[in-house]
């Protein structure tokens, strides 16, 4: 029990700490962007949603998934956020006590695209037939 009790997280998913830090970073960035605390008129005119933040196991890299309202100008939003990455990191370190300020990497949030694809799959006639067929209880 001694060796196994101190084993680090080796599962396929993120650890609780990664999830907790990612959520704190997400909230902090969303608040900063919502209040317009970054001094760039082009960035402040955009309404950007911070959908998810995924942290590396060592918490030194945070991948921030963002989407402008309406889904337009995604590349411009990512370029502007990347341009102000240092200022955004500064806001994060003021709000959180971490040993290292994570390097922020911005990516488009594809959650809604995946949701649309899932809906499309479930509405497919073949899938509907399989779903109805599996709920009959005819299996022996």
Swiss-Prot record:
A Pfam cross-reference name: RBFA
GO cellular component: cytosol
Compartments where located: Cytoplasm
Molecular function, one GO term: ribosomal small subunit binding
UniProt keyword list: Cytoplasm, Ribosome biogenesis
Top-level taxon: Bacteria
SUPFAM superfamilies in alphabetical order: Ribosome-binding factor A, RbfA
Coarse class of the protein's main subcellular location: cytoplasm
A biological process term (GO) from this entry: maturation of SSU-rRNA
PROSITE patterns listed in its UniProt record: RBFA (PS01319)
PANTHER family per record: RIBOSOME-BINDING FACTOR A, CHLOROPLASTIC-RELATED
Similarity comment: Belongs to the RbfA family.
Subunit structure comment from the entry: Monomer. Binds 30S ribosomal subunits, but not 50S ribosomal subunits or 70S ribosomes.
Function: One of several proteins that assist in the late maturation steps of the functional core of the 30S ribosomal subunit. Associates with free 30S ribosomal subunits (but not with 30S subunits that are part of 70S ribosomes or polysomes). Required for efficient processing of 16S rRNA. May interact with the 5'-terminal helix region of 16S rRNA.
Protein name: Ribosome-binding factor A
Gene designation: rbfA
